Swiss-Prot record:
SUPFAM superfamilies: GroEL apical domain-like, GroEL equatorial domain-like, GroEL-intermediate domain like. Gene3D superfamilies: GroEL (3.50.7.10), GroEL-like equatorial domain (1.10.560.10), TCP-1-like chaperonin intermediate domain (3.30.260.10). It comes from the Bacteria. It comes from Moorella thermoacetica (strain ATCC 39073 / JCM 9320). Its EC number is 5.6.1.7. This is Chaperonin GroEL 1.
Length: 539
């Protein structure tokens, strides 16, 4: 085991503070509409230019192991806020630094860190209640576009996100991809789409697009392979009598079963197609159950104990339209009962809440979207690769912030909400060192607005005092450099972002205040390579 070095008390806290401040200094210049850029070196390719707090924070690694611990904790504030709310990383970093610096001053002067922490927690709770009280629900397309435009710093992106959300609903999946051209567009896949196509090209009905399209088909959803035609014949005869097409989704269709389907299709006896089931293992089973619920059919699994030859028409699913391409299948407007689909959606949402795995969560979100109404793809275009990366990042940020706004509503932006929460904090009854903790938060609430003003080249203290004296909801528009009603001016933040930023900042800062010792590995000294043995020079 490598030897460790230790630091205690004031020395420990000072080292951590230095690390936090280093990260905060780099991150906070990006805050606000007039935030400055940070350029990040890349070993390969062009440098990255960004205004995104969490990207800057993740780049920073310090040489001193103690200071690096502080830097990592500061990174944690930014990334945690980003994970929960998708935005507010810079605000969280500014708040964490403010709470920590004020707190360390007081602890060094003899305040008890435990009571200081208690005061900080009480003040944060009060501010969170204030945020919840004043938050305004986001429902209209226009207000969604507003929120997204602010997060992305661009109206066009805001409109695209609002467009995508309107089309796929609040639970729909919206993915961000790089476009081949320079334009940024939204593409919507309606209905349920999965990445499996027809088993044989003979099933194609539209030779130009190489797709099989069926109106109001019956859909057989079978867990196992189908190879014997005798199992399938009774069902085929029933479907032929109805004159409707048949789509078979199974693990695989092969041998004489496939040959018979192809022959019937070519003769015009039965319009049909076979598709392999999507996914693998347990996920395949779950996806096929989803398809069954969406189409109002029965998933014919082994557990059900129903043989293929005994399948009735009422066990088959139905849909308004099914489109099958070489590598994807889309089921539009399944005829499943709304209550059954809603029940399945609620079940998947519960699984999303309970899972710890990011991968599982992503896959569950995809399943949820497919049931809830579709998937939208925002294709981001730009003139250069550097611009493309930066723009794609902004779109992803704006998307997460917009989801947060739809979830918990919006509050006045630009740091105004935190400043207007100060009177509520001042009313808290606290004594001794607990009152010190409350005062620390009260002072920290001014910092985001102060920093926004500083980045715009103005005097922060003057602006903070002016906003404090105004009615709640009035804040400072750093672009126009005037005092406005923030909601009317469209300068808003998702309530979830403001709340998460404060809670995460206070959590890390108060943890640092109560730190009494830090342990790190002793850095290895790199020895200079030995000189090669000299042998004189050869000429």
């Amino acid at each position: 085991m490598a030897a460790k070095q230790l630091a205690f008390d004031v020395e420990a806290r000072r080292a951590l503070e230095k690390g936090v401040s280093t990260v905060a200094q780099a991150v906070k210049v990006t805050l606000g509409p007039k935030g400055r850029n940070v350029v990040l070196e890349r070993k390969f390719g062009s440098p990255v230019i960004t205004k995104d707090g969490v990207t800057v924070a993740k780049e920073i690694e310090l040489k001193d192991p103690y200071e690096n611990m502080g830097a990592q904790l500061c990174r944690e504030v930014a990334s945690k806020t980003n994970d929960v709310a998708g935005d507010g990383t810079t605000t969280a970093t500014v708040l964490a630094q403010a709470i920590m610096l004020e707190g360390l001053k007081n602890v060094a002067a003899g305040a008890n860190p435990i009571f200081v922490k208690k005061g900080i927690d009480r003040a944060v709770e009060t501010v969170v209640d204030e945020i919840k009280k004043i938050s305004i629900p986001v429902e209209s397309k226009e207000s969604i576009a507003h929120v997204a435009s602010i997060a992305a710093n661009e109206r066009e992106i805001g409109e695209l996100i609002a467009d995508a959300m309107e089309k796929v609903g609040k639970d729909g999946v919206i993915t961000v991809e790089e476009s081949k051209g320079t334009a940024t567009t939204v593409e919507v896949v309606e209905g349920m789409e999965f990445d499996r196509g027809y088993v044989s090209p003979y099933f194609v009905t539209n030779t130009e697009a190489m797709e099989a399209e069926f109106e109001e088909p019956y859909i057989l959803i079978h867990e196992k392979k189908i190879s014997a035609i005798n199992d399938l014949l009774p069902l085929l005869e029933k479907v032929v009598r109805t004159g409707k097409p048949l789509v078979i989704i199974a693990e695989d269709i092969e041998g004489e079963a496939l040959a018979t389907l192809v022959v019937n299709k070519l003769r015009g006896t039965l319009n049909c197609a076979a598709v392999k089931a999507p996914g693998f293992g347990d996920r395949r089973k779950a996806m096929m159950e989803d398809i069954a619920i969406l189409t109002g059919g029965t998933f014919l699994s082994e557990d059900l104990g129903v043989k293929l030859e005994n399948v009735d028409l009422n066990m088959l699913g139905r849909a308004k339209k099914v489109k099958i391409a070489k590598e994807k299948t889309t089921i539009v407007e399944g005829y499943g009962k709304k209550e059954a689909v809603d029940g399945r959606i609620a079940q998947i949402k519960k699984q999303i809440e309970e899972t710890d795995s990011d991968y599982d969560r992503e896959k569950l979100q995809e399943r949820l979207a497919k049931l809830a109404g579709g998937v939208a793809v925002i294709r981001v275009g730009a003139a250069t690769e550097t611009e493309l990366k930066e723009k794609k990042h902004r779109v992803e940020d704006a998307l997460a912030a917009t989801r947060a706004a739809v979830e918990e509503g919006i509050v006045p932006g630009g740091g105004a909400t935190l400043v207007h929460a100060i009177p509520a904090v001042e009313k808290i009854q606290a004594e001794g060192d607990e009152a010190v903790g409350v005062r620390i938060v009260r002072r920290a609430l001014e910092e985001p607005l102060r920093q926004i003003a500083a980045n715009a080249g103005l005097e922060g203290s003057v602006i903070v005092e002016r906003v404090r004296s105004e009615q709640p909801g009035i804040g400072f528009d750093a672009v126009k450099e005037e005092y406005v009603d923030m909601i009317k001016a469209g300068i808003v933040d998702p309530a979830k972002v403001t709340r998460s930023a404060l809670q995460n900042a206070a959590s890390i800062a108060s943890m640092l205040l109560t730190t009494e010792a830090i342990i790190a590995e002793i850095p290895k000294e790199e020895k200079a390579p030995a000189m090669p043995p000299g042998g004189g020079m050869d000429y």
